Amino acid sequence: MSSKYPRSVRCCLPLWALTLEAALILLFFFFTYYDASLEDQKGLVASYQVCQDLTVMAVLGLGFFTSNLRRNSWSSVAFNLFLLALGVQWAILLDGFLSQFSPGKVVIKLFSIRLATRSTTSMLISMNAVLGKVNLAQLVVMELVELTVFGTMRIVIYNIFKIDYGMNMMHIHVFAAYFGLTVAWCLPKPLPKGTEDKYQTTTSPSLFAMLGTLFLWMFWPTFNSALLLNPIERKNAVFSTYYALAVSAVTAISVSSLAHPQRKINMTYMPNAGLAGGVAVGASCHVIHSPWIAMVLGLVAGLISFGGAKCLPVCFNRVLGIHESHSMHYTFGLPALLGEITYIVLMALRVFWASSNMIGFQVLLSTGTLSLAMAMSITSGLLTGLLLNLKIWKGPHVAKYFDDQAFWEFPHLAVGF
């Protein structure tokens, strides 16, 4: 017999979502208008192609990437689309209001959609840590809080540290990963015996997760270069991301076979380590001028991701009390920290080679922005986790974790689904 979505949530979720959408429509009506400037057709087409690539990554890539659980795949794909559609609207308004201090309407350009899509990606990453343990109403609340805090953080970095929007977006993986992990830490942790089958993977869901990985792998160079305005930096970002992804993919397959007693490849670790290179190189891809640096970074990121996914879950699940079924920490968190540290080292070396006495200031600046991103992600994640624990949201009971039957109608419910 299928589990029932709580009556209170069944009543309030449509009302809550439609009311929020109506409020967004009113805000767009009163405070926004389209950019009326005449752009050349070639530039417009190129800009739209970047938006299209980012949307494919978010919808297909991240949607299927989290569909590896046998009883939670429907929610993974559909909730991802819902949150992306809602989050882009909120992010466009938020970025417009925060970036202009004088009163006036927000001008919507293709770059605005590009920036909003990348900002919303932070929520789609964080969602991996809590997916299956919260309902859709809780995810909407989590999204509104995270996008607001993330947008505020970028404005603070822009105004205090004088780092433009393209550069301060490099903290997205660190912020998203540790925001999501902190929220997951606040949620009810014990999983009752007998429900382990719900968060086990099977062949078909794992294949869909690998399909999402392929979409992410193909379009990750666009993701890392989407907000860079300097043509040279954009070219460096594309090249560096490709080489880092290539090496991390080779590393994922090779190390997976090496670690298996019978030298077989384990599909479980492929999505994690295969993408780790793109995550790790994201912070420094625009300042890397030689392929070998990106390749070494991809190799180390792949090893860290594989080692973390294979050895650290016991520590996370039992010691820290964080049950993380989608390996988000090993795909985004640890590789992103490696990338941030690499960026700090590269910037320090650049200043040193230039015979400048500003090396200490540059290291302090880079370390300060990373520390701010970590502090704001953990603090806001803690507050969000406490907010999601309120009974008003009617979160799913631990016995109903990772179960699509709590949210979806199945025309013919098969035994053992």
Swiss-Prot record:
Which GO terms are recorded in the biological process aspect for this UniProt protein?
A: ammonium homeostasis
Give the function comment from the record: May be part of an oligomeric complex which is likely to have a transport or channel function in the erythrocyte membrane.
What this protein is called in its record is RH-like protein
According to the lineage, what is the superkingdom?
A: Eukaryota
Query: How does this protein sit in the membrane?
Result: Multi-pass membrane protein
One GO molecular function term of this record is: ammonium channel activity
Q: In terms of one coarse class, where is the protein primarily found?
A: membrane
Transmembrane stretches in the record are: 12-32, 44-64, 77-97, 125-145, 172-192, 203-223, 238-258, 265-285, 287-307, 331-351, 358-378
What the entry lists under Pfam families is as follows: Ammonium_transp
* A GO CC term assigned to this protein in UniProt: plasma membrane
Localization of this protein: Membrane
Signal peptide interval: none
Which keywords annotate this record? Answer: Membrane, Transmembrane, Transmembrane helix
Does Transcription regulation count among this protein's keywords? no
Gene3D superfamilies per the UniProt record, alphabetical = Ammonium transporter AmtB like domains
UniProt record similarity statement = Belongs to the ammonium transporter (TC 2.A.49) family. Rh subfamily.
Which species is this UniProt entry from?
A: Macaca fascicularis
